[in-house]
Amino acid sequence: MRNVGIAARGILLLTVLFSSGCTTVDYVADAGARVKAADWSTMETVDVTLEEYSYTPSKLRFTAGVPYKLQIKNEGTEKHYFTATEFFKAIATRKVQSNADGEIKAPYFSALEVFPGRSLDLYFVPVTKGSYPLHCTITGHEAKGMAGTIVIE
């Protein structure tokens, strides 16, 4: 199976909703319809870089209703998490893609783990306006400054 090969090679690990103990009630109810209705030809691309121990930029801004591709690149020497549980609850997710290696189509995520020298692309439509915390859940990384904010306007 292609997705198993990706995980086995250490290219990408996704923490999916059901493994985190969350329920679908917490997430955008009509996510599939919102993704389908979006005009992906107008998609905006936003880049964020992960390094020891930061997100650059540390504040990400998105407009509700606009389709996005968030390119998450780990230019560090350690693996890092892009953990933004409340943000993931506020968006309609289309898919996560790992370079040319494959993609995972799942409606719900709580975190993305990106290995050194690798990248992930998150395709989504922001829905619920607000300010959401972002941090790396690896012990000590947030304390060293690996935190940020995601705003949906």
Task: Report residues per predicted region.
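Extracellular/periplasmic metallocenter environments
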Residues: 23-29, 54, 106-153
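Bacterial N-terminal signal peptides that target proteins for export
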Residues: 1-11
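N-terminal edge beta-strand
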Residues: 38-67
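A eukaryote-biased signal for short, well-structured alpha-helical docking elements
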Residues: 24-41
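Short beta-strand and strand-turn-strand segments in soluble, beta-rich domains
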Residues: 99-107
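C-terminal motif of bacterial Sec signal peptides marking the signal peptidase cleavage site
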Residues: 18-21
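Beta-strand cores of secreted/periplasmic/IMS beta-sandwich domains, seen most often
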Residues: 58-83, 119-128, 152
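Short aromatic-acidic-glycine turn motif
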Residues: 88-99
